[in-house]
Amino acid sequence: MGIEEKAPSGFMLAKVSDLVGLIRKSSLWPVTMGLACCAIEMMATGTPRFDISRFGMEVFRASPRQADLMIVSGRVSQKMAPVVRQVYDQMSEPKWVLSMGVCASSGGMFNNYAVVQGVDHILPVDIYLPGCPPRPEMLLNAILELHEQIRSEPLGANRAEAARAVEAAALRATPTHEMTGLLA
């Protein structure tokens, strides 16, 4: 005998945060940040065979001001790192980052001075997608995982402050190339 039985038909009971999360996850606009081979697989995700538009991501944005998801696909060189950070800073809040491929996540086979050993050195990363290169199906799965993160994100007056704290903590964290015992 709860309120659900007493509500007239046509009414839905939900929290505002649940509705906002549902709307946000269904309207991600990714910015193009294809830097190497993984970009080919990212482009393939937009083709009719994989159809990323069924998740509300019809068009990859060329302007960071119109995007809220950055998919970093491929290695990031030291010269490109400030540009990647500038594009991230120009994106509107709330914003998310997906690191696509082993090169973006940890530098991959390019273990030298010219390549950033993981994009997490310059950006807070929400989802790491392994593979060289990862298949479009894996990218779609990572996007679905990100959807779940977005849907369950809290709302409130201090949301921007909390986001800055999370970003600062992510940038202070131990980089993946310095971690030991991950495979043991």
UniProtKB/Swiss-Prot annotation:
Keywords: 4Fe-4S, Cell membrane, Iron, Iron-sulfur, Membrane, Metal-binding, NAD, Quinone, Translocase, Transport. Its cofactor is [4Fe-4S] cluster. GO terms for cellular component: plasma membrane; respiratory chain complex I. It is found in: Cell membrane. InterPro entries: NADH_UbQ_OxRdtase-like_20kDa (IPR006137), NADH_UQ_OxRdtase_20Kd_su (IPR006138). NDH-1 shuttles electrons from NADH, via FMN and iron-sulfur (Fe-S) centers, to quinones in the respiratory chain. The immediate electron acceptor for the enzyme in this species is believed to be a menaquinone. Couples the redox reaction to proton translocation (for every two electrons transferred, four hydrogen ions are translocated across the cytoplasmic membrane), and thus conserves the redox energy in a proton gradient. NDH-1 is composed of 14 different subunits. Subunits NuoB, C, D, E, F, and G constitute the peripheral sector of the complex. This is NADH-quinone oxidoreductase subunit B. It comes from Beutenbergia cavernae (strain ATCC BAA-8 / DSM 12333 / CCUG 43141 / JCM 11478 / NBRC 16432 / NCIMB 13614 / HKI 0122). The gene is nuoB.
